[in-house]
Amino acid sequence: MQKVTVLCVGKLKEKFYMDAAAEYAKRLSRFCKLELVELPEERLPEDPSPAQIEAALLKESAAILAKLPSGAALIALCVEGELRSSEALARRMDAWASQGMGQLAFLIGGSFGL
């Protein structure tokens, strides 16, 4: 069974989202071993400078690398990225599994990206 880790910078705060994440984890448990890892988002002032943002991103990237499962294929998710249907993603995950990628890590960045 494929192991899937979702690394996200920032925490789920609203009960609706926490409940939805739990429901998806339950539904996916038949197909993969799912782990959700929430990493703290670096605190920044209200109007951060580019240097402050860069420093925060470096700290967040260190936290991501520390939690990234060894040997996992890393897939960064982005709002500007390619939209895939559930079926297309399932086919892609099957292809990765066939290629020996038994462990996947999906990454969701914080407010200022990755």
Identify what each model region corresponds to.
Residues 39-42, 111-114:
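Mobile beta-alpha loop/short-helix "lid" or hinge segments that flank ligand
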Residues 16-17, 85, 114:
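Secondary-structure boundary/capping motif
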Residues 12, 79-82, 110-113:
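Short glycine-rich anion-binding loops that position phosphate/pyrophosphate groups of nucleotides
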